[in-house]
UniProtKB/Swiss-Prot annotation:
This is Malate synthase G. Involved in the glycolate utilization. Catalyzes the condensation and subsequent hydrolysis of acetyl-coenzyme A (acetyl-CoA) and glyoxylate to form malate and CoA. Pathway: Carbohydrate metabolism; glyoxylate cycle; (S)-malate from isocitrate: step 2/2. It is found in: Cytoplasm. The keyword Amino-acid biosynthesis does not apply. One of its GO terms (cellular component) is cytosol. SUPFAM superfamilies: Malate synthase G. It holds the Pfam family MS_TIM-barrel. It comes from the Bacteria. It comes from Rhizobium johnstonii (strain DSM 114642 / LMG 32736 / 3841) (Rhizobium leguminosarum bv. viciae). Mg(2+) binds at residues 430, 458. The gene is glcB.
Length: 723
């Protein structure tokens, strides 16, 4: 492969040419200065990056040794004393309040769903950006949120019986979200706007008003017969679409043809766990899509029902306010970008000594450069109206690593001529050392932080790896009931509120991983806003629309205010180790656990390694489709490695299980023409060997991360195909 030397950086030609030909020409940034500054950042900060990773390993060695001598901690005071002694658990400083400035309301004050989407896939990225609004009728009709009983089957064509149930559900929702005086929404016959108020006439001819006139936010069309009514509740919008020409509208007394909800308020465009980018060629795909999003010209041809069309970013729409004055409603999700963490290095660029550069530094510099199309001196200001860039930084271990990310961002700002603290930071609370030192982590980024989020999946993977030597872990399905989990979730909210995040930043909760089970999500995920989270992750635009209903039912700002006086969750609970005290699992239970873990690992890894797909819906052992990414992979691999280490299972048992479940995964992928079967090809299947590595060498992986194995095996496969 060819490289271009720029100030001591040997950049792969495909990446260099992308920067020089596609990114830099549209910006008021001198190319030579950019590369000189980029090189200085890499050469100054890469040694610090390496030192922080070495510290992770040093701490793990000490913790492993302690567990070998003591087992799972019985005396929590003694355990905490040890963690303080080695510098794992740090002293907590005085109280403070974050001081982040120029934060868009989508993050600072609007509570609502958040999508995480692989930015490597242009279609998914566009769908997510456009998921700021979604049809509640469609979301209910097309999912199991409405049961298919009593003749309400989905079918291949429109089922009026099902439609009636959807409409009834939505009318009940409107009765609680924007109630009318002396009238139910099911009895509405017409709308008009008079004297700055929404006037409703019932099918009986009676006039009614909104119980709270502040719920009326605007309209489109003629005031006497509007085509769109905009309502607002708890800071987020509802749009009622009136159109008698449609099948639904014609049959409706008020000609309501649809009800749309403001849905994915924010979206994380992901360069990390949901993608498979292992070389310069892959990274250019990532960066090119981010460029299209920042320039506003990303497009993708989409084939549907025998025809195709070009999907682009939705434009904002003009509405008339209650007073008749025009205003604009945002129709795109506010975009954050998730860079990779501090661990990985990339072959896309080599430093002056021939070392691969830290990928997190590369991401910060290049995604930051591209963001100038939105926030630079001549930026569009179509993503961030306040001129901020939002970077989610994952997998950081403790405040020293957060401070290092702050230093990277500062250096990038200087290189790009941006004011200090333009680049905001989202802190993923997904590593144990960050959790227990969360207040100090936030302090390290107090002028930049816009987001803290519990990542149950990665956090469980780190929990298992950190305490690998303590004993065999409880079964994976029992982990959600472990003492540390609820304490961790509450602690994140408690610390966030203590540090003044309310009204300034997001306090987030994790992913609903079952995209087909929307009825269950509607029932259960309301727990997130009730717990004080003003955002939570959803797996699809449809899920975002359904989850948005929870933010109409729960006033998160009020919940947060009520939680400020709650006693902080206990550190001792967070530090409790989820080992099985007296494991008495039957052979059948052990095998079922192995089967379930192996199936998830293989189903995800085979598509990652063979096809470069970083996020997959993988059927579990009960045939429930689960969203799998590297975080879920980390749990499953570490869990199997833990049981192997503590002799709950044998290596032979794991290999037999993997081989048997490979055949199951092969059958599940039989309809995919690009799929390469693993069964009968175990020695030559690079994907199967990667899955085995993740388990059999799980204890050796840094903090239990899966990226080193996946990247190595994917590069091996790509090299094999180009040989």
């Amino acid at each position: 492969m060819s490289r271009v030397d720029k100030n001591g950086l040997a950049i792969e030609t495909v990446l260099h040419d992308f920067l020089v030909e596609e990114v830099l020409p549209g910006l008021a940034v001198d190319a030579d200065k950019f590369f000189a500054d980029f090189s200085a950042i890499v050469h100054d900060l890469a040694p610090k990056n390496c030192a922080l990773l070495a510290k992770r390993d040093e701490l793990q060695v000490k913790i492993d040794d302690w567990y070998r001598r003591h087992g799972a901690p019985a005396d929590m005071d003694e355990y905490q004393s040890f963690l303080r002694e080695i510098g794992y658990l740090l002293p907590e400083g005085s109280d403070f309040q974050v001081s982040t400035q120029n934060v868009d309301p989508e993050i600072a004050s609007i509570a609502g769903p958040q999508l995480v989407v692989p930015v490597m896939n242009a279609r998914y990225a566009l769908n997510a950006a456009n998921a700021r609004w979604g049809s509640l009728y469609d979301a209910l009709y097309g999912t199991d949120a409405i049961p298919e009983s009593d003749g309400a089957e989905k079918g291949k064509s429109y089922n009026p019986k099902r439609g009636e149930k959807v409409i009834a559900w939505v009318r009940d929702f409107l009765d609680t979200s924007a109630p009318l005086q002396d009238c139910r929404w099911k009895d509405v016959g017409s709308f008009a706007v008079k004297d700055g108020a929404l006037v409703v006439r019932s099918i009986d001819g009676e006039q009614a008003m909104l119980t709270d006139g502040k719920h009326f936010a605007g309209y489109r069309g003629d005031a006497a017969a509007p085509t769109h009514i905009l309502l607002k509740n708890n800071g987020i919008h509802i749009e009622i679409v009136i159109d008698a020409a449609t099948t639904i509208g014609k049959a409706d007394p008020a000609h309501i043809s649809d009800v749309w909800l403001e849905s994915a308020i924010t979206t994380i465009m992901d360069c990390e766990d949901s993608i498979a980018a292992v070389d310069a060629e892959d990274k250019v795909v990532v960066y090119r899509n981010w460029l299209g999003l920042m320039k506003g010209d990303l497009q993708e041809e989409v084939a549907k029902g025998g025809t195709s069309f070009i999907r682009t970013l939705n434009p904002d729409l003009q509405y008339a306010g209650p007073d008749g004055a025009a205003f604009e409603v945002h129709r795109r999700s506010l975009m954050l970008v998730r860079n990779v963490g501090h661990l990985m290095i990339s072959p896309a660029i080599l430093d002056r000594d021939g070392n691969e550069v830290p990928e997190g530094i590369m991401d910060a510099a290049i995604t930051g450069l591209i963001a100038l199309y939105d926030i630079g001196p001549s930026g569009r200001r179509k993503n961030s109206r306040t001129g901020s860039m939002y970077v989610v930084k994952p997998k950081m271990h403790g405040p020293e690593e957060v401070a290092f990310a702050v230093e990277i961002f500062s250096r990038v700002e200087d290189a790009l001529g941006l004011p200090r603290n333009t680049i905001k930071m989202g802190i993923m609370d997904e590593e144990r050392r960050t959790t227990v030192n969360l207040k100090e982590c936030i302090r390290a980024a107090r002028e930049r932080v816009v987001f803290i989020n519990t990542g149950f999946l990665d956090r469980t993977g780190d929990e298992i790896h950190t305490s690998m030597e303590a004993g065999p872990m409880i079964r994976k399905g029992d982990m959600r009931q472990a003492a540390w989990i609820s304490a961790y979730e509450n602690w994140n909210v408690d610390i966030g509120l203590e540090c003044g995040l309310a009204g300034h930043a997001q306090i987030g909760k994790g992913m609903w991983a079952m995209p087909d089970l929307m009825a269950a999500m509607l029932e259960q995920k309301i727990a997130h806003p009730k717990a004080g989270a003003n955002t939570a992750w959803v797996p699809s635009p449809t899920a975002a629309t359904l989850h948005a209903t929870h933010y109409h039912r729960v006033n998160v700002a009020r919940v947060q205010q009520g939680l400020k006086d709650r006693a902080r969750a206990k550190l001792s609970d967070i530090l409790s180790v989820p080992v099985a005290v007296r494991p008495n699992w039957t052979p059948e239970e052990i095998q079922r656990e192995l089967d379930n873990n192996a199936q998830g690992i293989l189903g995800y890894v085979v598509r990652w390694v063979d096809q470069g797909v970083g996020c997959s819906k993988v059927p579990d052992i009960n045939n429930v489709g689960l969203m799998e990414d590297r975080a879920t992979l980390r749990i499953s691999a570490q869990h199997m490695a833990n049981w192997l280490h503590h002799k709950v299972v044998t290596e032979a048992q794991i290999i037999e299980t993997m081989r048997r479940m490979a055949a199951v995964v092969d059958r599940q992928n039989a309809s995919d023409p690009a799929y390469q079967p693993m069964a009968g090809n175990f020695d030559d299947s690079i994907a199967f060997q990667a899955a085995l590595d993740l388990v059999l060498k799980g204890r050796e992986q840094p903090n239990g991360y899966t990226e080193p194995v996946l990247h190595r095996r994917r590069l091996e496969l790509k090299a094999k195909h180009t040989a």
